[in-house]
Amino acid sequence: MKKFDIVKNKYKFLLIPAVIVLAGIIMYFVNGGFNYDIEFIGGVKMEVAMDGDKNTEEIKSFLESETGISPIVVQTTEKGISIKTKAIEEKAKKETKEDAAEDSSVLNQAKDENAGKIFEALKTKYELTDEALLSESSASASFGKQVQGKAFLFTAIAVLLILLYIAIRFEWRSAVMSVIALLINILVMMAVYAITYTPLNTTFIAAMLTVVGYSINNTIVVFDRIRENMKLRNPKRGITVLTVVNTSIWESMGRTINTTITTLITILLLYILGVTSVKEFAFPLIIGVIAGAYSSIFIASTFWAAWKESAEEAKKIKK
């Protein structure tokens, strides 16, 4: 039985991530950008101990109407709820004089006042004590910019090291296609965040770097199989580069799918059973693992095959 020609249909497989990325770009502009968390744009985060059922939407609506602070993000935690409020620095700048707004002490005071308003409203509504405030932290927008800069730097370093490693182990074309596949994975992850308007924070950066390392492993497995099977190439017998790559993909597909499924089961359990902080890490991992498996099978090796074939044809013409 003749197996489906994956290499021949490479552009059809590219269509799926292309549609997701396009949808992400559209939603990015519709939403006015990503939903950055306080680590990136500044704000206050606190954790409050609360017993019983916690309706986060009800608490959010109550706090926004009672304090006049918006937006407020409320999430459940193991011990109660976590509360995040963003754009506090911008609010402080509007409410203070222009020269005073640049003073960090004024901005910190504004953050403390808003945090105090939120907790006092909760205390009154739900009859809490001062001990219910488990933790409180704040971040400035300038700190957020530093975090973003470091995130891009670390990602770029990781990609360059991967490019170098694969170029040494295989060849430079394999390295280029592997990096392109990685970039597609990252774009898909960011697109899903734009579509779902999920808060983008430092946990996403950690998950993204994890996915980069995980997905490249699947790509290496496929390229390793291709390298082994290239010894059997015989154009006179119809065993071309495209044939070898298609066979190699099918031979390594079972391993890739099995590894991906077992990994996904673990991550899904973490997402379903974990607290908010665990869910924040598991969600991008789910997206990245699926995207990584897809790109390693249907994108990296297939487009490498087309590139390799066209390069060899060009050499023949020159001769």
Regions picked out by a protein language model, each given a short descriptive name:
Residues 1-319:
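A structural signal for conserved, well-ordered secondary-structure elements
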